[in-house]
């Protein structure tokens, strides 16, 4: 203990104390560096915040280097400040390169602005999601099928970007799928990662549609690597299923003017006027809400672009 005490005493008290203080202030370069440090440490998060912090801190260290070289004439102070300036400069270049490299096609940029950006998802996280679907938007032509009842396997998760999808079971209309809604969220949620299944409904394009598709196995690998993305998709899929249940609730009738409420366990029904299905407000573009055209849909495979 005595040796430790003597060490700390020598470290703290061995240096000579300042008897007289300088009356004159340091040069303007020193004060400019201090101001840049204060303002620089007020930066926020994200790419913009990093660029802000590294640029101002780099300028502050550069001013400190100039001050140490011209006024103090201390090689060690100059060396350390110049090294810190070089580190900030390299970090600024690296962040700038990352910002320039994170760019998407128009449809993916619109999808980010409409769905992911309001949730606070950064561009780096969104880039991982886009790369998982190979940055590809698939085209589904009018009256072509995305899935057929009892035939199409459940091997992917798709999100509608534009157009409108009609969902039917045994030829009976259930509900529509609009932009920014998943095409197969109930099927995805009904299966475990190791299970396989087939669609119990038919999904047909009412208009020319564009959608993004993530392969099941590839998406689960992404979830395993990034738990945040897994929680994000869990929230999005749960919200999407809830919207589909509300849309399906409008299709359950007792008689004229009466409807069941499938959200309640006893199927409590209320008297409401019949209204056509209305798309949710969260979508990329507005489409007409006409009824499905008669005829047998052409269920050829969609085109990739």
From Swiss-Prot:
Family, per entry: Belongs to the popeye family.
Alphabetical UniProt keywords: cAMP, cAMP-binding, Glycoprotein, Membrane, Nucleotide-binding, Transmembrane, Transmembrane helix
Domain of life: Eukaryota
Protein name (database record): Popeye domain-containing protein 3
Subcellular location: Membrane
Membrane-spanning parts: 34-54, 55-75, 77-99
Topology with respect to the bilayer: Multi-pass membrane protein
GO MF annotation, one: cAMP binding
Chain's gene name: POPDC3
Region of interest (Disordered), residue spans: 273-305
Source organism of this protein record: Gallus gallus (Chicken)
């Amino acid at each position: 203990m005595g040796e430790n005490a003597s060490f700390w005493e020598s470290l703290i008290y061995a240096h000579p104390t300042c008897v007289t203080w300088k009356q004159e202030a340091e040069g303007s370069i020193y004060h400019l560096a201090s101001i840049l440090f204060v303002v620089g440490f007020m930066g926020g998060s994200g790419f913009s915040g990093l660029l802000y912090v590294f640029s101002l801190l780099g300028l502050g260290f550069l001013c400190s280097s100039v001050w140490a070289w011209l006024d103090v004439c201390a090689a060690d102070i100059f060396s350390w400040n110049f090294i810190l300036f070089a580190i900030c400069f390299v970090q600024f270049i690296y962040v700038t390169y990352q910002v320039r490299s994170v760019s998407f096609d128009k449809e993916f940029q619109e999808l980010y602005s409409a769905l992911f950006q309001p949730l606070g998802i950064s561009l780096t996280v969104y880039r991982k999601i886009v790369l998982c679907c190979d940055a590809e938007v698939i085209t589904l032509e009018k009256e072509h099928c995305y899935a057929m009842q009892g035939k199409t396997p459940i091997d992917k998760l798709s999100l509608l970007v534009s157009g409108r999808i009609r969902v039917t079971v045994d030829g009976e209309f259930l509900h529509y799928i609009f932009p920014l809604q998943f095409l197969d969220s109930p099927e995805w949620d009904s299966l475990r990662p190791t299970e396989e299944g087939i669609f119990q409904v038919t999904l047909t394009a009412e208009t020319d549609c564009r959608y993004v598709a993530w392969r099941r196995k590839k998406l689960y690998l992404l979830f395993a690597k990034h738990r945040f993305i897994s929680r994000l998709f869990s929230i999005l899929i749960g919200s999407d299923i809830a919207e589909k249940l509300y849309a399906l609730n409008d299709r359950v009738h007792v008689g004229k003017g009466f409807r069941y409420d499938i959200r309640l366990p006893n199927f409590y029904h209320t008297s409401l006027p019949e209204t056509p299905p209305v798309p949710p407000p969260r979508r990329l573009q507005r489409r007409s809400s006409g009824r499905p055209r008669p005829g047998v849909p052409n269920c050829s495979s969609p085109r990739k672009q």
